Amino acid sequence: MRILQRALTFEDMLMVPRKSSVLPKDVSLKSRLTKNIRLNIPFISAAMDTVTEHKTAIAMARLGGIGIVHKNMDIQTQVKEITKVKKSESGVINDPIFIHAHRTLADAKVITDNYKISGVPVVDDKGLLIGILTNRDVRFETDLSKKVGDVMTKMPLVTAHVGISLDEASDLMHKHKIEKLPIVDKDNVLKGLITIKDIQKRIEYPEANKDDFGRLRVGAAIGVGQLDRAEMLVKAGVDALVLDSAHGHSANILHTLEEIKKSLVVDVIVGNVVTKEATSDLISAGADAVKVGIGPGSICTTRIVAGVGMPQVSAIDNCVGVASKFDIPVIADGGIRYSGDVAKALALGASSVMIGSLLAGTEESPGDFMIYQGRQYKSYRGMGSIGAMTKGSSDRYFQEGVASEKLVPEGIEGRVPYRGKVSDMIFQLVGGVRSSMGYQGAKNILELYQNAEFVEITSAGLKESHVHGVDITKEAPNYYG
């Protein structure tokens, strides 16, 4: 019998407090998603079909994190989800939606409804700006067969030239009391658009995680051999791909990773793994971040069904030991129940954590809403559950093409308590991590990793750590018993 090591998870250990002059409100939570992509908070929403579609991804990016859109959908639908995130706000919209003057108001309504916008620039056949169609122009129009050119606000309009800053644009829009500012070149060709909505969101969400074009960042999951999906997602503007598998240390994953890095310019996160050897092999094949965790999730049964996995603390420690030598970020995926678990993962060297169950109960998640015994819940299932595998995740568990009645699940379907908005949940998690860093005297995540010291605790120590000897009469927003 070969026992490699004693393996621990979050509840087996505590961090020891240190002398500190650091206040929680003063710490920095900036971190990295991948080798090249920054995060303003170290939180990622999981690529699960009851956790992340465009609404969750938008909410996460606005708060400074990122969402990974799941792949249990056809390529076109996943691309649309990415596009919705990318078009939800921009500093400058470099590829604005436009319409021609000869089109009807009915055509314009289809465009504004589809993209959820309140107005659209009007151009001629050469791309020259000739007007703009706004809510005010169409508010009292009942004849949708009218031509756009007969109703629009015609030139001259207030415009700006390419290169204007957002601060200058804001001043110009305030001066002229307009909500949309077309960007044109010297020949009056439409090149972009700035909206007051985007400027307001910039003020409302100062920590938003954005790309170089001022668009919210978003990731997307892909499976083995899905190069066509990867190409379409990259064209749609995805910031990172997550090559997702229950066993990331497999030949097919390594081959797919090498193919993607050879043919596309995009950061690739790869997982899931738990060993030093796996981490080394993924980095050698081109991984820009390594995702860690086999079996720690609340809805995952891999460790029971297959007898395989590793407690999450030891898994993180294994992988960080290798990845840190190559300056490759590690993502701790699964097993997070409390904000203290997040702090422990970061102190072990993870650059960020991936959250599933805690976000599945939020308003923005795509899971079904339900009421059971008078309490509000949302559906939540593992990607290894029968329901998820029949929808498209069976390849993650090496069962692609298997009939539904022959699938061997490695996850369950259930429900989690409704937890309000994503922002409410992230606020509590961020607050807990800030508090932990204050106890540790760590001004940033790197200092937390460098300075943290741990003690292993007994079952009695764990019992003492939780609420005990009292009946809870009012639930706390960050403690679930």
Protein language model regions, located:
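Bateman/CBS regulatory modules and CBS-like beta-alpha motifs in cytosolic regions of diverse proteins
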Residues: 23-39, 46-48, 77-115, 122-124, ...
